């Protein structure tokens, strides 16, 4: 399993834990996951993101992906929703397949028969088409996002609190309010479309069905790795 992480390292930790737990659960005993991970420095990436220099981020991440491939990974995960904006460039830089986080999430929605879904994430993920467009065009889902003021609040909490490992109860209340608004607008479930959000809000906090993309992406990686190992 190839992991492209560090955006932020806080959420990459969640991937590492979930994948190893998943392998242990499936194979038992002392089994753990075979992982090749490249963890980037998030500060320059975040600067490029907010400057709108996606080409710059694609270059950095494509180089990291090539190193993961060289380390022997059979397939690749980008351990962040937002940087799937440059997934096509990263995919083109390597020969190994990329497991896309939106596709993994859409599979779970299809399995549960959910058609209309709310999306929380960074402003980039909520506003641009690389993620919600893929859910709509490829998977036929109706995607609802919060109104602008709430989008700014969600984005700010991610970068100024969660990426730094800070959990504020006030922010949690705000997120739960925004989730309720999306549900009232017809969302049958809400995608926590940023790998940090699961640190703040969990299923136990709300009756609205939440989809934690870190957990879903990690489960998909485990199933893929074990399937490949058995096929091989």
What do these predicted regions represent?
Residues 1-232:
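Non-catalytic structural scaffold of enzyme domains
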